[in-house]
């Protein structure tokens, strides 16, 4: 039976992924949600915690897939780079700024980076997420209807309100969809 682990985005909680978990369960997947305090630690630290979470789970008998929303997708990039053997299925990211985040850079340039972004900026939102290891399948879904902080931060172009569509691509990506 296929398994999926869901990761939330910045300033969210694992429960934010519960409606998506219900939909996946209805399609026959077993689903877990992984929660992490997005601004308290760095992405490599979150990836290490995800590895401990995966090691304590019972995921034998089928591929292990991952879905990450926004920052959760960057945690998955760090996880896949450090533990490629643990990714037996695919990674799908939803609105993840794979090549850095202009919104995060604008927040940081206003002097609000530490209180609002914490450890999430370095190694990820700054565009320094690790490359995908060979053999890891990653697909990205981007939004194109602006809702959120984008206008206040002066984002222009196709975006979901926080992440520009162009930021949701990365080298080695298998597929990219814009909704």
PLM regions: where:
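Serine-dependent carboxylesterase/thioesterase catalytic core
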Residues: 4-10, 15, 19, 23-38, ...
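C-terminal catalytic-base region of ester-bond hydrolases, centering on the histidine
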Residues: 133-179
């Amino acid at each position: 039976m296929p398994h999926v682990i869901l990761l939330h985005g910045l300033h969210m909680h694992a429960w934010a992924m519960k409606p998506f978990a219900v939909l996946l369960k209805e399609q026959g997947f077993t689903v877990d949600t992984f929660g992490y305090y997005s601004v308290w630690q760095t992405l490599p630290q979150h990836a290490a915690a995800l590895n401990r979470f995966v090691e304590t789970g019972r995921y034998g008998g089928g591929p292990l897939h991952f879905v990450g929303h926004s920052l959760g997708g960057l945690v998955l990039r760090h996880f896949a780079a450090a533990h490629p053997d643990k990714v037996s299925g695919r990674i799908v990211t939803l609105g993840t700024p794979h090549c850095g985040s202009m919104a995060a850079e604008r927040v940081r340039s206003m002097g609000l980076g530490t209180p609002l972004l914490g450890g999430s900026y370095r190694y990820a939102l700054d565009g320094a997420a690790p490359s995908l290891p060979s053999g890891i399948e990653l697909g990205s879904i981007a939004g194109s209807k602006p809702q959120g902080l984008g206008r206040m931060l002066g984002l222009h172009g196709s975006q979901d309100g926080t992440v520009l569509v162009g930021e949701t691509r990365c080298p080695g990506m298998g597929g990219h969809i814009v909704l």
